[in-house]
Swiss-Prot record:
Family recorded in the similarity comment: Belongs to the long (4 C-C) scorpion toxin superfamily. Sodium channel inhibitor family. Alpha subfamily.
Tissue and organ expression note: Expressed by the venom gland.
Annotated transmembrane regions: none
Name of the protein this chain belongs to: Putative alpha-neurotoxin RjAa13
Amino acid sequence: KEGYPVDWGNCKYECMSDAYCKDLCVDRKAKSGYCYKLNWSCYCEGLPDDSPIKTNGHCRPGGRRK
């Protein structure tokens, strides 16, 4: 699947470089990833079906963990 990976607080990962997002996505078993610069967030392609991605829920910043 594709989407914005989220941390424990349901927050997207902010980015400025494609390399950061590629590493983050590959760590989550995705095929690839990049920094979507229109909203400065990592976007992953080829994630496993059970990987959490951003949905309509609110971001709870206290939950940031890698």
